[in-house]
Amino acid sequence: MSSLPVIILVIGIFGSIFLVIGYIPQVIKVIKTKRTDGISLTFLISLNIACFLFVIYSILVMIFNKHNGIPTALPLCLANTIVGILGLVILIYKVKNIKKAKLYLMDEKTYYEKYVLNNL
């Protein structure tokens, strides 16, 4: 293996690691506080669609580019799988909060402050 594919692989691995590390604190915060009113639903849906598409893309690269596909696409596949799962966790909290707020005829922030915050 020449040095260029190794450099590309290392960049992919570090990019993937930082992508996952950057996402973990937000997921922990949402799980602990159950607060999602500051996170856009459009963002979460777009993120999950993007992660899904990147996973499909990287799998296709690994299948059809057998010479260099697996080393270069594997970090992308793993990172987007993990971030997609983490994003899905936040999306589930977000949708639950929106539904509960609508039951009380409130916006998400008011619902959180009135019903969730006092129970933490």
Swiss-Prot record:
Q: Any idea where this protein resides?
A: Cell membrane
Q: Which domain of life is it from?
A: Bacteria
Q: How does it sit in the membrane?
A: Multi-pass membrane protein
One CC-aspect GO term: plasma membrane
Keywords, ordered alphabetically: Cell membrane, Membrane, Transmembrane, Transmembrane helix
Query: Which Gene3D superfamilies does this entry report, sorted A to Z?
Result: 1.20.1280.290
Q: Name one Pfam family in it.
A: PQ-loop
Where primarily located? membrane
Which regions span the lipid bilayer? Answer: 4-24, 44-64, 73-93
Family, per the entry? Answer: To U.parvum UU007, UU008 and UU042.
Instruction: Spell out the protein name for this chain.
Output: Uncharacterized protein UU041
